[in-house]
């Protein structure tokens, strides 16, 4: 068990889908050595199939009795987009068998394949962005599934890491993670994942995806720091919710659900209806039954600000400075 736990809060009302977080992570950690297909950080358009494709249906996690599920599957490479970066260079440059450099395989999926598609028909369509990283769970299924004890939680901060010297490449962890955030390096024969940028954390720096976020949607810190934004958003105000808590892994990435600030959908007669554009049931399927109360709290605090009244919650969510948004 870790002595303390770092956690994240992502405010989905501020995410603009710019993928700066993804590129920061990609350039730092996964642009070489068999990691080309890996996106430890990715930003999905929801509703959508996500990355890897249909990850919500891959199984894994724990059952209601707390037992590790054994029904998880290992996504095939096509679910990630195929052999990314694998081109016919030999045929074109050395053998003269082709005139144009193209991938060996035609991609049928990728990390942004269904970007901005969402759900519904214009003008009643809707979508929002969902950034995803490893949840650094308090009860990680990947750890429970590993027979070589290669996966552990760092005692000082709860970050989940893989000991590469102990990993034997059995991929039970890939099957067990219900979020599809454990990857297998085919070149090295080892499992790899987001490491929470712990080399940066040890130097007092925030993770790269947090530090580079253009929309300032990311909050980061210790869960038990009562003066920090994580504790206040998760425990005090209860507006930040875990993704698929029913998986039983106790994730430490939380989300402020998107508010329905856009006009409601049109009725058949052309008038604006009274239903929210993003169906509440869609949000509850992701973030659980606390969505309605979280949205009600957010709406109430925003109403106070429109009346020129003070609101601690909106001040926290604005995150005026880096110090306001993160720190350990």
From Swiss-Prot:
Cofactor: [3Fe-4S] cluster; [4Fe-4S] cluster
Gene3D superfamilies (UniProt xref): 3.30.70.20
Chief localisation class: periplasm
Binding site for [3Fe-4S] cluster: 146, 167, 173
Short name of any one Pfam family annotated for the protein: Fer4_11
Organism superkingdom: Bacteria
Stretches assigned to the 4Fe-4S ferredoxin-type domain: 6-35, 125-156, 158-187
Cofactor binding notes: Binds 1 [3Fe-4S] cluster. Binds 3 [4Fe-4S] clusters.
Keyword Repeat: yes
Protein's name in the database: Chlorate reductase subunit beta
Species annotation: Ideonella dechloratans
